[in-house]
Amino acid sequence: MRFKRVRLRAPAHLLADLRDFYDGIDTGETELEFAASEGEPFYHFAFLAPWERFDELAAGEEVFDFPDWDARAFYFHDPAGNIVEVVAHRGLEDPTGLSELGLVGDTRAMAAELEKLGLELWDGTFEEGRLAFMGERGRTLILAPASRGWMPTGRPSERHPVEAELSGPPAGAVELEGGLYRIVRS
């Protein structure tokens, strides 16, 4: 599974700032878009980085180690306040594009729908307050219950519209959380 296109929402007055900000970041194979929205939506998502370049990219940042995943990451905020992660997984082939995208809601119900697209739970659990990871190591939809704190800030997760197109079989589409999220696989 790979993220081909992701469309998120942001306040209209920040769209130009976001375009300028992400124009300077290599988003690899993923097309990242922002559309105007009411309110102040925010998301958690992560970009892949090559393992060999991680220390260079993370210079001056607080680094978090994930030994169970053989991964390292650092975090920052973009102009809209999104919690953005840069993560490197040792041994991951072709580490480009988006690595993670957080979806907030009923984790068990979302997982049941995502299984129709061939995505499997590869880590985590559906226990109350816990995260579930669908997809594969390095290319993951993170299912989070509402109000669970995102790393590293602890900021409570919120539900905001997401449209995502994933590559790889089987082809199909699902809508989650009453149509708030639309996930297409082609």
Annotate each PLM feature.
Residues M1-E33, W69-A71, D106-T140, A146-S147:
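Core segments of cupin and vicinal oxygen chelate
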Residues K4-A12, A36-A59, R72-H77, G97-D106, ...:
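Vicinal oxygen chelate
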Residues R19-D26, P50-A58, V87-R90:
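Short, intrinsically disordered, charge-balanced linker/junction segments flanking boundaries
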Residues A59-K116:
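Surface-exposed beta-loop interaction hotspot
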Residues E120-G124, E128-S186:
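Charged, low-complexity intrinsically disordered regulatory/assembly segments
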